[in-house]
Amino acid sequence: MSIIRTVPSTRLINGQILETSEMAIISETEYKTNGEDCIIVRNVSESTVILDSKTTDHIVVKSMTRIIIKPDTGKIDEDYDEIVADKYSCIEFRFCSGNWYILSSDGLKNS
């Protein structure tokens, strides 16, 4: 289990300055986003990614394994408490007005 971070980045999220990284490669069974532009989830059989609205307002999630994506608050696309993404999926999320919205995706199944 590991987290590999790339280029350090300073971002302004919800009026707070956050020290984070542009990208993270995640090999954990559960991970909470931390302001990254992109995360890649790999080397685990399944993982749960929690979209943290306090530290993240926009993120791309690339899955190299099956993942469950949950918001810390609100819903995804105003309807879903969680979504399931199959291996090789790529999904772009934006937090707005208390919910997470899918801006772009491939490989999604009905959750």
PLM regions: where:
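Parallel beta-helix/beta-solenoid repeats that form elongated, surface-exposed shafts/blades used
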Residues: 1-2, 81-83
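Exposed extracellular interaction/assembly regions and N-terminal maturation sites
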Residues: 2-73, 95-111
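A conserved acidic, glycine/proline-rich C-terminal tail/linker
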Residues: 74-82
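Surface-exposed loop/turn and secondary-structure junction residues enriched for glycine/proline
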Residues: 34, 79, 86-87
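Extracellular disulfide-bonded cysteine-rich modules/repeats
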Residues: 87-97
